[in-house]
């Protein structure tokens, strides 16, 4: 190589060459390679049998190093004996290939013959066609059901899952009605309080309403007459006013119901006499056709004809009209029949008992309401559970 810096492989990346980082740069004979046996460039043109073929000997001993084999010198090496493990057969032998089915079971190739179906009775032949143990035709016995008896009791294979939508809707319906009922109840309870405030304001024109029956134990406790505490003497008068307001609201609801029934044609009317265009004469009687019959519109007679029909005026006495409304509601809401014994007992009370009950509610009702008010929301829940479960 000498001082020729353009020689091949100057940094000695091939075998048996070492790199000198300083390559004697500070000397008169700089060099990159520490190998003392490296070939000089003029010797690379000599003819010789090297690793790259005859006539070319690469510098530095060739790509494969300085060994005789690298320089193209062929030597005969003794062959090593094979390992001892290959001299004998040991362990599991490979599974031989299975012969074709047409050679082992020629009758199986005849698909439409009875011989093939008979051959399928052989478990070995069946395994070739139906590894899972199935059947190809209806002539074969089906695979027995391996399901346990306990599992067949609780569920049948293939049954669809229960419809959770129908199950949840049966509970969500009453709960939504209950929630709407509580919402309406809270709104309805504010109506008597507003009417009570308007009623008491009539006695205090031009001034703020102040309760005249203040508690003697606390003369300085001024309060509104619409929010008297139970210890105030004006508390019972407040309850009486609200009771009258409730009756007035019920009367308005009854009038609205009568107007609605009359608009829908469900009020009792007099039937026409067959063969005539006029109604029958006679006193107004109670309804003769109950609501559970074929017709939901009861028929009765009256003395005020109007275009062939007439409305029963006055409304049938006693409980006739209430009985009709009850029967009409019982047809549409079957669970109301469970309240029939209680309603019959309540309707059979004498007027004296009614007045006594009203007086007790007016006198002890506020105190009982304060005691039972935490449990009142539970009553509709228990009632729904009792009806639907």
Swiss-Prot record:
Residues 109-163 are annotated as: Pre-S2. Residues 2-108 are annotated as: Pre-S1. Residues 2-170, 264-337, 388-389 are virion surface. The chain crosses the membrane at residues 171-191, 243-263, 338-358, 365-387. The keyword Transmembrane helix applies. Residues 75-107 are annotated as: Disordered. InterPro entries: HBV_HBSAG. A lipid is attached at residue 2 (N-myristoyl glycine). HAMAP family: HBV_HBSAG. This is Large envelope protein. It comes from Chimpanzee hepatitis B virus (isolate United Kingdom/LSH/1988) (HBVcpz). The lineage of its organism: Viruses, Riboviria, Pararnavirae, Artverviricota, Revtraviricetes. The gene is S.
